[in-house]
Amino acid sequence: MDYDLLRSKKSIKRVESTKSNPWWWDSHIGLKNSKWLENNLDEMDRSVKRMVKLIEEDADSFAKKAEMYYQSRPELIALVDEFHRMYRALAERYENITGELRKGSPLELQSQGSGLSDISASDLSALWTSNEVNRLGRPPSGRRAPGFEYFLGNGGLPSDLYHKDGDDSASITDSELESDDSSVTNYPGYVSIGSDFQSLSKRIMDLEIELREAKERLRMQLEGNTESLLPRVKSETKFVDFPAKLAACEQELKDVNEKLQNSEDQIYILKSQLARYLPSGLDDEQSEGAASTQELDIETLSEELRITSLRLREAEKQNGIMRKEVEKSKSDDAKLKSLQDMLESAQKEAAAWKSKASADKREVVKLLDRISMLKSSLAGRDHEIRDLKTALSDAEEKIFPEKAQVKADIAKLLEEKIHRDDQFKELEANVRYLEDERRKVNNEKIEEEEKLKSEIEVLTLEKVEKGRCIETLSRKVSELESEISRLGSEIKARDDRTMEMEKEVEKQRRELEEVAEEKREVIRQLCFSLDYSRDEYKRLRIAFSGHPPTRPSSILAS
């Protein structure tokens, strides 16, 4: 078995030295793992959006539309070229990946061998462990290669792997091969195996050949053991009960030793009896018969002793073999435990990779849908480009007469613009002149207002003075009236003296007339002053309000 394990390890190293690294498949097929694919798709989306924006961009007039078309035409052509380049790159990448997948289609594996039932499960597990120990260093692929279940079986039980007669072996049916062939291009997890599938298939074939050779050697080695070992090797437990077998052998060895000891004791007793009876020299028949009987017993015991010694040596050999097998079974138990742990971890990783494979499959389906959508979009864009080229040629034919008319209109508008510019300059000069005049008028108005304010102040002072004079005259008039009333009373008092004093009255009358004349003169002067003050006040008020002044009254004129 050690030789087989060593040879298996050497073959694994030889096969792994020729293996290629399949991890680049993941970076080329998944959108999340491929930076190149993600960048190209983003750039394609941006280019399509820019192209649609340039195509749908609107203008106010046909001339402006034509000008915009001439300006955006090179950019549109560049965008279409870039879009076509990225599409071709994606198509080539997809074609390369699908081609590699078709090349890596699985081959039919048929394992044929005889006498596989003679191999114990521990030997098979150890052999498989030696072949797979280096391979578990990287994550397992999402899809098991054909023949993987053949080596593992249902939970590692050899009863599921082989028939009892040991002549039949597991094979792959046609339906399984068809499903494998169809899953090459439809199942994304298979991409993780990639280009090293052929080397893996070759490796599996080598392992099958080595298993057959190891099986033959083990069968030849196990043929020399006792028949009691064969049912234990073939049992579903896959392990020989070596401790129980060792205990049975030890017990059998003890019994044989006890029998040997008893035989030796009997031989010693018989020899002592023979030595005691031989010197007597009895020549009678009874003594001779007893001696012959003792000799027969000695020979029988010697034969039994020889047989027992042979059996003891055989038992000791078997005991040594059993001890070696027990030690080997202990190491096989440790290997089996490690193999079971590795198998559980491998199954967990296989489940994880299966989930990842389903996610990758969904991503690939989305990518294929997106590629088909981009193909249809590209066809639509090609039709739009052809329509735009047709519209451009029609527009170029129709735009020449309109262009001449537009040039004439532009020349006429330029002349009108020059004329309007001259008029605008004249208007600006007039506006500046009017602004200067307005400033002058405002300055004169301010000066006039200041002058009028000063005159109003003077007139106000005069009015105050005249008011005082009027008050003084009013007091004088009141005094005169009081004097008149006093004189009237005196006249009444002196009525009696009228006659007597006619001269005196006449004189007084003349004086009174003179006083009255003076009074009238004073009143007339006061009225004249009042009228003059009133007229001056009205004239000032009218001057303030902006009306032309009126002439003085007739009283002032008189």
From Swiss-Prot:
UniProtKB keywords: Coiled coil, Membrane, Vacuole
Xref: Gene3D superfamilies: 1.10.287.1490
Pfam families the UniProt entry points to: KIP1
Protein origin, superkingdom: Eukaryota
Example GO molecular function: actin binding
Free-text tissue specificity from the UniProt record: Expressed in the epidermis of the root meristem and the early expansion zone.
SUPFAM superfamilies xref list: Tropomyosin
Domain NAB: 21-101
Sections of the chain in a coiled coil: 194-363, 421-527
Stretches the record annotates as Disordered: 162-183
Subcellular location: Vacuole membrane
Annotated Gene Ontology cellular component terms: vacuolar membrane
Task of the protein: Plant-specific actin binding protein. Associates with F-actin at the tonoplast. May be part of a membrane-cytoskeletal adapter complex.
Free-text domain note: The NAB domain, also called NAB (NET actin-binding) domain, is sufficient for F-actin binding.
Family: Belongs to the NET family.
Protein name, per record: Protein NETWORKED 4A
